[in-house]
Amino acid sequence: VKHNRGPGPSVQIALSRIGLAGKEQGEDRGFPVVLVHGSFTNKGFWLSAKGRGMASYLVEQGFDVWLFEHRGHGQSPRNDDYQNNTVERYARFDLPAAHEFIHEQSGRYPAWLGHSLGGTIIATAISGGFMTSLPAFAMFGTQVVRPNMALQVPLAGPIARALVSFKKELDGRQMKIGPENEPAGVINEYLARHSLLGRWKLPSTGEALLPKWKSATTPLLGVSAAGDTTDPAKYCQRFYRMYGGPKEELLLGVENGFSKDFAHIDMIIGEDAEREVWPRVSNWLGAYAS
């Protein structure tokens, strides 16, 4: 999708539509659902090279599944201003363009599901008022309220942001945390938000987003994992409970009847997630599929 929205005409976003073999062009594929990956990864988070993942499962359950990839990730090419990409730009320009494109193709507005940073992008689009007509959205291991203790020291945040800006991007393979890079703009947004006196806001205007989060009305499924050390459950739950619209929460842990305390990645990926988590997500989506 080349949407020509916002600064820079070079932006193109890859949207991959997943379907069952034998489905004819134009045939009703069911209720559309968009999956948004987190940082340092791509659509492979939802669909493995062997064709298995939450994406293929939801297709089998009758949903019309689309995979959204951030700028410069997977099949989305790098734009000319790659190092200055931000969550705000994704939320303000890319998600609304994809939302409208899917509506044009399917005749329905999709539900959006995001993991970690993917959830933050969706939450920013909703709180910023950039994307409307959503039937529902879900977030997995997403929060914007946990203070990063290393960044609470005065000047730690500005120094870290200066170093990241100098590097222009962080290499996920070099850091052994994923197959993709992240631009300085996205990293610095995170550092500013979680530093001393930081808050969730739009960098371009300084507008605080939590007040709008508290007044939003789209139905939310907030999923947290009891064993998550990246975005701990208590912070995800705190963020979800601030939301003003209809919401359901799901804590993936032994105390709630699950086989284990799920963690940040295996809440989505693996046989345990396939058996215990994916069906819950499918059932929740089914309520909005009419």
Residue ranges of predicted features:
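Catalytic nucleophile loop
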Residues: H37-G38, L58, L67-E69, P110-I121, ...
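Alpha/beta-hydrolase active-site loop
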Residues: N84-E104
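Short beta-strand/loop motif that positions the catalytic acidic residue
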Residues: A216, G222-S224
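Short alpha-helix in the alpha/beta-hydrolase fold that links the catalytic acid
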Residues: T218, D231-M242
